[in-house]
Amino acid sequence: MIRIVAAFVLLSGLWLPGLQSALSAESCTRPSLEQTADLYLQALKRGAPSLLPLAPGATYIENRKATPFGEGIWGSPLEVDFSRSLLDVDICETFTEIISAKTDHPYVIGTRLKVVDGAIAEVESLVSDRDDWLFDADSYLKYSSTEKWDILPPETRSDRQTLIRVASDYFDIFEDYAAFDRVPWGIPCVRIEGGAYTNPKNEPNPSCTAGVPKGGGVPMTNRRYIVDELLGAVMGQVDFGGPKGLPDAHTFRLEDGKLRYVHVITLCPDGCPVIPPPEDMPRP
């Protein structure tokens, strides 16, 4: 219907405010975003950004720094052991978790793609390695690859605003523990944090409240979200500790309105803070 209206408007020499954004929204579909995310992965595996469908003036940001395509993680082909993508048709962006564990230089990567009119306008990656928070790519691969993140039945999904609110409430806990009770904790629920895992003994009814901070006045600022309602998932990208804090991405999945999975990638560009493990964090 939008295309019919657009054709009429163009033929009549008129242009309606907001029509361009409506057309862009119509052209941004789940299959097109999935294809773009797949093209990104194929290009990364070959170390060939030239294979990306880039928009004119497209930018690449790696670990919060503007980086030329072809440098950084693009410097050589990347062996990808596992990946998972969130597709947000509302804002035409994707987020892909990428695990490269079986190499001499392992990585866990979180990449955001911004798509405009079918082309990639922005690529932003958080590339974590051995010097980053609780990093263990083998552990991350072991646990993430066995989780079930399939499309949820409609009756078990949460809407966009609910998913964002849950992520926001979770982030609020770091500054004020009063937010803890606002989070819909589920059982079972597990968290992968860098590679640390909250259910190493494979208990039948684990909780991902283990190791959650008890409120330490730590702000989580510059919050940006990518939402995939069909997966019940939301990724929140933040500055851990306030402006110029640690680059961080938390990914959440809700099932039946309850938290089921939490994944965390946190970079330590100037070295990780020395923090003793929480007393309630399970040990292997």
How should these model regions be labeled?
Residues 23-284:
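C-terminal and inter-domain tail/linker signature
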Residues 6-18:
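Bacterial N-terminal signal peptides
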